[in-house]
Amino acid sequence: MAKELYNTPNLDELENGPWPSFVTGLKRLAVDDHDGADMVKDVLATLETSYVTKKGYWKGGTVGVVGYGGGIIPRFNELKDEDGDYKFKNAGQFHTLRIQPPAGMHYTSQLLRDLSDMFVDNGGSGLIAFHGQSGDIMMQGADEEGVQRIFNVLNEYGFDLGGAGPAVRTGMSCVGAARCEMSNANEQAILRTLVNAFLDDMHRPALPYKFKFKVSGCANDCMNSIERSDMSTIGTWRDDIKINQRSWVKMVEDKGIDYVNDNIISRCPTQCMSVDSKSLELSIDNANCVKCMHCLNATSPLTHKYNDIGDFSGILSPGDDKGVTICVGGKRTLKIGDLFGTVVVPFMKVETEEDYEAIEELAGEMIDFFAENALEHERTGEMIERIGIVNFLEGIGLDVDPNMIESPRYMSYVRMDKWDEEATKWFDNKKEQVA
């Protein structure tokens, strides 16, 4: 006989109102015919108890699969009866498997069905998140034996565990070059290069704290890499924005100059765009363009309407000289508050095998420096705030570049010692690049 749902009046309140409720989803899993249904019932009962007592009953521990030191988030239930046994024994363990997604997060619908069925067929709760904040597929709810069984089947599908704990974490990349017209690099190849190079650091935690990679193909930063990753790789270009003047003029004639001025021209952060009053053609002062992506985003949905048949170019498109900008130190609140990434490589081509090796080498320098110099439970951005960006750049072997900063400082009192040496070094580097 199937186990009955517990009475959960406090959780039931969360099902009221117009918005979807996680409680409704858990109840559906609890009454479905699968091996993990009783686990979900007891999880609901534990959560109801927490709402009554205002206490949390989940604690960490150590759970893993053979050969791995990370990738599992252990959760044990501390809610016991008078005899010291689990009050809700089916929820005594509720561990989470972090699974690395494919680069660009490409799945077939059949694969998603197979993963869902496999999870519950091996004792899982059925609760899956696509994807967690680190980019993982989160299979939430399995006991220790179930964790190993589920992992074994996942391996047969070709999946591997992601990172957890003080380690290199699972990376993320946008869909990018696979389907997006804004892409400036092969995002999937960059991510794959980094993951393959540092997989051992992901599966065997040995760092002071977490280290994350994220790759976005343009400054829209769909992966939120500049805010959420220690090494953020963002696609960009360094030549001129490409303008399809024929389609642009059609759009202005149809939408009207007021619409274009209000929604595109006036919203340029550096005011580097202007429209000729007679020809209606667009001019861009590309030297002052900061690649904010607004004009490209505003015109992209209209391209199909104003392009000639057979013309697949955007009204506005990224330039042809494409590459990436690399930032370090992005993170959410921890010790010193939220941080955006700091530019350390203003522009880098990523086309040849040597280019990918250079990114891998730079990432390795960052991880090694982080491992040796960060304090316990300190992210890369916090370490840089503590030791200074100049020391960090010196430690990873990068020269200071004026393009790393948005604008010069306004303080007139500046130290000028070593100014001549640094200026000479800068011009020598420029000559080497030209050569």
Task: Label every model-predicted segment.
Residues 1-84:
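Charge-rich, low-complexity segments
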Residues 4, 12, 29-33, 65-71, ...:
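Small-residue-enriched alpha-helical segments and adjacent helix-cap loops
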Residues 45, 51-108, 170-178, 341-348:
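Short glycine-/aliphatic-rich beta-strand segments at the starts of folded cytosolic domains
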Residues 124-131, 164-166, 204-210, 275-278, ...:
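Flexible, glycine/charged-enriched surface loops at secondary-structure junctions
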Residues 145-155, 385-410:
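Terminal amphipathic helices with adjacent charged low-complexity linkers/tails
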Residues 171-174, 211-219, 380-393, 413-415:
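A glycine-rich phosphate-binding loop feature that marks nucleotide/adenosyl-phosphate handling sites
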Residues 242, 262-265, 269-270, 274-275, ...:
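A structural signal for small-residue-enriched, beta-sheet-centric alpha/beta enzyme cores
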Residues 405-435:
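Intrinsic disorder at enzyme termini
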